[in-house]
Curated annotation (Swiss-Prot):
<comment type="similarity">
    <text>Belongs to the PanD family.</text>
</comment>
<dbReference type="GO" id="GO:0005829">
    <property type="term" value="C:cytosol"/>
</dbReference>
<dbReference type="GO" id="GO:0004068">
    <property type="term" value="F:aspartate 1-decarboxylase activity"/>
</dbReference>
<keyword id="KW-0456">Lyase</keyword>
<dbReference type="Pfam" id="PF02261">
    <property type="entry name" value="Asp_decarbox"/>
</dbReference>
<keyword id="KW-0865">Zymogen</keyword>
<comment type="function">
    <text>Catalyzes the pyruvoyl-dependent decarboxylation of aspartate to produce beta-alanine.</text>
</comment>
<keyword id="KW-0704">Schiff base</keyword>
<keyword id="KW-0210">Decarboxylase</keyword>
<dbReference type="GO" id="GO:0006523">
    <property type="term" value="P:alanine biosynthetic process"/>
</dbReference>
<keyword id="KW-0068">Autocatalytic cleavage</keyword>
<feature type="active site" description="Proton donor">
    <location>
        <position position="58"/>
    </location>
</feature>
<dbReference type="GO" id="GO:0015940">
    <property type="term" value="P:pantothenate biosynthetic process"/>
</dbReference>
<keyword id="KW-0566">Pantothenate biosynthesis</keyword>
<keyword id="KW-0670">Pyruvate</keyword>
<dbReference type="InterPro" id="IPR009010">
    <property type="entry name" value="Asp_de-COase-like_dom_sf"/>
</dbReference>
<feature type="modified residue" description="Pyruvic acid (Ser)">
    <location>
        <position position="25"/>
    </location>
</feature>
Amino acid sequence: MHLSLLKAKIHRATVTHAELNYEGSIAIDGLLLEATGIREFEQVHIWDVTNGARFSTYAIRAEDGSGIMSLNGGAARHVQVGDLIIVAAFASMSEDEAKTFKPNLVYVNARNAISHTNHSIPTQAA
């Protein structure tokens, strides 16, 4: 059996552009792609923290260090510039692989620069 586990996420990034007439995708600062291990053209899920929208698209690389988080094409209709989003990618793996796998979690500041990284999410308390 294969499991689908969170591979990587960019947590609470700020949307910098929403380009309706650009070919569909999300352009992500290249440094964030490298930090997460998300590859160009990989499917990603977008969860808009501001408005609750949830959808999927694919990642393309934006200029390194630019802070760009640009939703393009039809995806641009689901967000507004300034919205906070989570970008997540998943990977399929065996149960044995899943036992030792750790996701790449990247947390960013208001300018979409990396503030810190982690490989686990703290336990949620009551």
